[in-house]
């Protein structure tokens, strides 16, 4: 069975290689990924289960050039089922042509050798700036 550290390393490697199904296979059937601050830019905060994970990962995999994690740092948690990490991305979003530079912080909880919960924190202004058609202007409500 994989430890949380091994799962996070394998997850980051799979995403960086564009191997969506390999990444999804690391999650428990009811496992998911959560972005607590995505609500601030009107995006769903949680994707749970294989189909929801596919809906999340497909646009990431298909919509960015060179979406590869780098400068990966992994820190032990309270036991082998918990780990935290920091990792960066520097990619280009195809739809907007804008560069996407992001520092993620993540906490992974493993259960029975699978990812039960991955919570990632990131700069949502950078998400909007790089990915939304009009950048951060899309966040401002027009009266």
Ranges and model annotations:
Residues 1, 42-46, 97:
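Alpha-helix initiation/capping motif
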Residues 7, 19, 56-57, 104:
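Hydrophobic alpha-helical segments typical of transmembrane helices
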């Amino acid at each position: 069975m994989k430890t949380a550290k091994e799962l996070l390393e394998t997850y980051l490697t799979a995403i960086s290689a564009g191997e969506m199904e390999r990444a999804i296979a690391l999650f428990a059937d009811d496992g998911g990924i959560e972005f607590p601050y995505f609500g601030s830019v009107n995006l769903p905060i949680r994707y749970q289960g294989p189909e929801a994970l596919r809906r999340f990962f497909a646009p990431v995999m298909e919509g960015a050039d060179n979406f590869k994690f780098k400068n990966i740092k992994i820190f032990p948690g309270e036991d082998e089922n918990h780990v935290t990490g920091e990792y960066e991305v520097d990619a280009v979003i195809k739809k907007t042509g804008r560069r996407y530079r992001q520092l993620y912080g993540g906490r992974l909880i493993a259960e029975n050798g699978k990812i039960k919960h991955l919570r990632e924190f990131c700069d949502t202004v950078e998400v909007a700036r790089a990915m939304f058609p009009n950048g951060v202007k899309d966040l401002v409500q027009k009266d």
